[in-house]
Amino acid sequence: IPCAIDPLVRQTAQHRFRQTLAAAQKLGIRQVVLHGGFIPHVYFPEWYVEQSVLFWRDFLQEVPPDFVLALENVMEPSPDTLVSIAAGVDDPRLGLCLDVGHANTCVSRTPPLDWIAPMAPYLRHVHLHNNRGQDDLHAPLDEGTVPMGEIIGAVLEQAPRATFTIE
């Protein structure tokens, strides 16, 4: 967890991210999706952003110029923290991954469609799966309350370089 309070946990996260980067490079992969580690009611959003910006600025020194790390929303209530991290780091090697199913769970206070515009300048990848607005069910695209057609259309229009994965 890049924003962990315990420095040993941050060091472990950095070690695991290095291992992931090395494995990806060995396989010829140029983009990896990572979880940023936000946990509601544990981290103050401002502190999480501040610590994450410091962590990623430091870690990106080890990342090749043609490689992208995309931070995925998992438990964030809105896109604000991830967008603030990407803007604060201000490096094309750090992008964002929108998981539309996660944006449609009980932890999100922002409808999935409303995540796209703020994330668009940094959006590099999108995870597509559906649910009924509470739990992270990873249901088929047509079984849930996420407006998939609108989501895909908005991403293609606002972040045309983003890639997609059906989860």
Regions found by a protein language model. Name each.
Residues I1, I39-H41, N130-D136:
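Conserved radical SAM core fold
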Residues G144-G153:
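Glycine-rich S-adenosyl-L-methionine
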Residues H35, H129, E167:
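Conserved residues at the C-terminal ends of beta-strands
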Residues V53-T145:
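Acidic/histidine-rich catalytic cores of soluble enzymes
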Residues A13, A24, V32, L69, ...:
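Conserved, mostly hydrophobic/aromatic
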Residues R16-L27, V83-A86, P111-P121, I152-E157:
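Short amphipathic alpha-helices and their capping/turn segments at secondary-structure boundaries
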Residues P2-G95:
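Active-site acidic/histidine proton-transfer and metal-coordination neighborhood
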